[in-house]
Design a protein with these regions (language model features):
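Acidic, glycine-rich flexible loop segments
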Residues: 136-173
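Post-signal-peptide N-terminal segment of Sec-exported extracytoplasmic proteins
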Residues: 40-73
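Bacterial N-terminal signal peptides that target proteins for export
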Residues: 1-9
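Bacterial signal peptide processing site
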Residues: 22-24
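Extended, aromatic/histidine-rich regions of cofactor-dependent oxidoreductases associated
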Residues: 172-206
């Protein structure tokens, strides 16, 4: 018996249409998504062409566009910074096994699907002698869809102690060691594992 393909093609086209329209975003959310996508395109341009990119260091890694989850506004949170009264200097490991000293500065909190989570904010010193602040984390996607060592979020300190920060996991990124073995990067501690699949931000490169 001969089966017509027309109904199947029609259903396939409908499913593609529904897939592209699966979420109803507000105009503000759509503007945010466009901003994230623009940022990602600019980062690809940097990674491909800039001399400081890991893809141009010793020419050992071939560039290809970075992989991401689709931007998802539900992975954007607000939190103040809760500074630790005693800011301990602790030792962490780099991916090549070397010890590094870092200050456990404070933490941020967020709620997802009615569950509370916490991530530490660390203070370090760059090679140029500049202070920097960062969040390093692993989650349920680590070693699967995302880089096994973990991912990072930059953190810009505001002098106002009551300032409300935006914690945007759509901006979570891989450290350079995810692309090239020439680099060593900080390994997130077990304390900074969140029992949640953070399906936002950058995916595994390899």
């Amino acid at each position: 018996m001969k089966v017509s393909l027309k109904p199947l093609l029609f259903l396939f086209s409908i499913s593609l249409f529904l897939g592209s329209c699966g979420k109803n975003y507000t105009p503000e959310q759509r503007k945010y998504i466009e901003k994230v996508e623009k940022y990602r395109a600019e980062k690809d341009e940097y990674m491909k062409n800039d001399p400081g990119s890991p893809f141009n260091y010793k020419g050992k890694v071939h560039f290809k566009p970075l992989k991401y989850y689709d931007p998802d506004p539900s992975f954007v949170f607000k939190s103040r910074l809760y500074q630790y009264e005693k800011k301990d200097t602790i030792k962490i490991l780099g991916t090549k096994g070397e010890e590094r000293k870092i200050v456990k500065f404070g933490f941020v909190k967020f709620n997802f699907d009615k569950k509370d989570y916490k991530l530490n904010v660390y203070k370090g010193v760059s090679r140029d002698g500049e202070d920097y602040y960062s969040i390093w984390f692993t989650d349920k996607t680590s070693g699967k869809q995302t880089y096994g060592v973990g991912r990072y979020l930059d953190f810009d300190l505001n002098p106002d102690s009551s300032y409300i920060y935006t914690i945007d996991f759509n901006l979570a990124y891989n450290p350079y060691c995810a692309y090239s073995p020439e680099y060593s990067c900080a390994v997130p501690s077990k304390e900074d594992h969140i029992n949640l699949a953070v399906e936002a931000g950058e995916k595994n490169f390899h």
